[in-house]
């Protein structure tokens, strides 16, 4: 058993009795998990958190009396516990979920809008895996932490479109949205590279997330579209349910999207993006693997290093989930292991080194 020889206790919060039953059946089907209680709205959720002291809470976003966001604020302030949001596949649901991640939720699971029981059963493995990972999250990440982000007033002048000669390829999963929102404001407007970002998210959520990132960043951020030219000072977020790759067309780096089979159980996956970026940009590629479960991005790091690029991984102390960075580091192909707050400056330095024609070589530095 994962927690001192006992089962992981889960509180299920949803206004739909049917949804609560579906989630309870899924959770109780795993020998390491048990539902310790249930609640129909945010007010009941706060009472039940105090009563059954769960290890993890699954929290519906939209509920009567008190919604999931308001309940989350109270729970994180009074009884810090890992929370996984259960979100409807709507624009409102996606926007609220991004806010919830900023407020301290660890992760989210999309709630399909039709044929709920069939779709949720398909999500069984994902739900169980996310609950188990959430239960392991260190307590230092559990607090009400509305990320203080200022909406950036971007220069109104139209920036010239310059095809990127350097690519920064970033992979992130669980804990990624919160972490990326902290570092993207630090990238300079005149970054002489294009950023390619794969954040594991379903359709709809990536668009909301790209808009949120754009609102706090000096660089332009958008959800990637088929045929986008990768340009300097711009970031492209892989859309949910599509792999994002890079190819050369008429001498320019161009984004292509496809629905090839899932890799590591996800689509988009970071590996195909990073591998094709390395093929197109060669030694002018910077690879970054951030917080997340699994090992997506590790193969991408290997291919970037083989081409002579520069590779970076987030350290364990600042990773909400250390799975992906750990897998990347274990390849032996990571140049820099740095805390979250040092990622932007390390990326900027790497871009400067590439522009100057230098090479970092094997400088593995683990920052405590």
From Swiss-Prot:
UniProt xrefs under CDD domains: CheB_Rec, REC_CheB-like
Gene Ontology molecular function terms on file: phosphorelay response regulator activity; protein-glutamate methylesterase activity; protein-glutamine glutaminase activity
Known EC number: 3.1.1.61, 3.5.1.44
One GO CC term, this protein: cytoplasm
InterPro entries: CheB-like, CheB_C, CheY-like_superfamily, Sig_transdc_resp-reg_Me-estase, Sig_transdc_resp-reg_receiver
GO biological process: chemotaxis
Catalyzed reaction equations: [protein]-L-glutamate 5-O-methyl ester + H2O = L-glutamyl-[protein] + methanol + H(+); L-glutaminyl-[protein] + H2O = L-glutamyl-[protein] + NH4(+)
HAMAP family tied to this protein: CheB_chemtxs
Protein's UniProt name: Protein-glutamate methylesterase/protein-glutamine glutaminase
Species, as recorded: Pyrococcus horikoshii (strain ATCC 700860 / DSM 12428 / JCM 9974 / NBRC 100139 / OT-3)
